[in-house]
Regions:
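Small beta-barrel nucleic-acid-binding modules, primarily SNase/OB-fold domains
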Residues: 1-178
């Protein structure tokens, strides 16, 4: 169901975190922010919110090669600078790097996290307690895998982003925790 753009301008109250995902909930007003810069395929800077990390998805790192660059380019196309997005927080609002963890909604109501997953440009990354939309995101990733979209189009993609960051494959270096 498309969420009309006008809903984003109504207010900035967040939906009840404990409520199930329903059409009624999706029509609830969301907080909004304006995209100012795309960092990579799963993070962007957003007005006064600061760095936003898309929940439940993990894009290849830019240093991983073309896959990382493709994911960033796709996010730039979906939510270019100046796009006002609706944002929804799950249980844990920040990650270990102090990025705001959010589900982001495009002006037409599509969930940005899910769109990146459905395009096959990210893997699913579940970190409890943030699991509100896990079935939805995992389903989109599974659909992309079955239809061989994005990362799944060839057998070349063999290093999950989290493994790359940990230095377990592809020449990545472990990233220090803060």
């Amino acid at each position: 169901m498309a969420l009309p753009f006008a809903i984003f301008a109504i207010g900035c109250a967040r939906p009840d975190e404990a409520a199930a995902t329903t059409a009624v909930e999706q029509q609830s007003p969301l907080a909004t922010c304006t995209v100012t810069r795309i960092s990579d395929g799963d993070s962007f800077d957003c007005g006064s919110t600061g760095r936003v990390r898309l929940l439940m998805v993990d894009a290849p790192e830019l240093a991983q090669g073309k896959e990382g660059r493709l994911a960033k380019a796709a996010l730039e196309r979906l939510a270019p600078r100046g796009t006002v997005v609706g944002i929804e927080t799950d249980v844990r609002p920040k990650d270990d790097y102090e990025r705001t963890l959010e589900y982001a909604y495009l002006p037409d109501g599509r969930m940005l996290n899910e769109e990146m997953a459905r395009a096959g440009l990210v893997t699913a990354l579940v970190y409890p307690p943030n699991v509100k939309h896990s079935a939805r995101i995992r389903g989109a990733v599974r659909d992309a895998q079955e239809k061989k979209r994005g990362l799944w189009a060839t057998s070349f993609f063999d290093c999950e982003p989290r493994d790359y960051r940990a230095g377990r494959c592809g020449g990545g270096r472990p990233r220090p925790r803060r």
